[in-house]
């Protein structure tokens, strides 16, 4: 596993958080997790991930703040925003997440190939 490609997953739903972790580990990446935005931002400050995947709608600090703060602290780190609300008329829209600084916005539910493909596109495949 490539220790140099560490993905931080910030997701309040434990089932989806575990699923994303499993997908990214199976793809060969190292994965860290946080259950809400404030903890995710603190983790990003301490460990400088290669890429951040964040839910937009979470209790406490939401994904919009995560995108802005990660971009402020580490301008080169890509962020993938995820949300079920991207498919509805409620909350942040995908283009708004991109305008905040997200590199990609994926609507839930998404497929494994879409998430892993976006990670590979943004940071490259893990080293063999």
Locations of the language-model features?
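Active-site residues of response regulator receiver
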Residues: 55
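The feature encodes the CheY-like receiver
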Residues: 17, 59
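Non-catalytic signal-transmission and effector/linker regions of two-component phosphorelay proteins
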Residues: 1-8, 113-128
């Amino acid at each position: 596993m490539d220790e140099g490609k560490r993905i931080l997953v910030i997701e309040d739903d434990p089932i989806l958080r575990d699923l994303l972790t499993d997908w990214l580990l199976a793809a060969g990446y190292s994965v860290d997790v946080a259950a809400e935005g404030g903890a995710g931002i603190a983790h990003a400050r301490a460990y400088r991930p290669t890429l951040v995947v964040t839910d937009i709608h979470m209790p406490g600090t939401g994904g919009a703040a995560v995108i802005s703060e990660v971009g402020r602290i580490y301008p080169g780190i890509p962020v993938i925003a995820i949300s079920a609300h991207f498919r509805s008329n409620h909350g942040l829209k995908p283009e708004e997440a991109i305008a905040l600084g997200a590199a990609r916005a994926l609507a839930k539910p998404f497929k494994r190939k879409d998430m892993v493909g976006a990670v590979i596109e943004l940071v490259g495949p893990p080293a063999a």
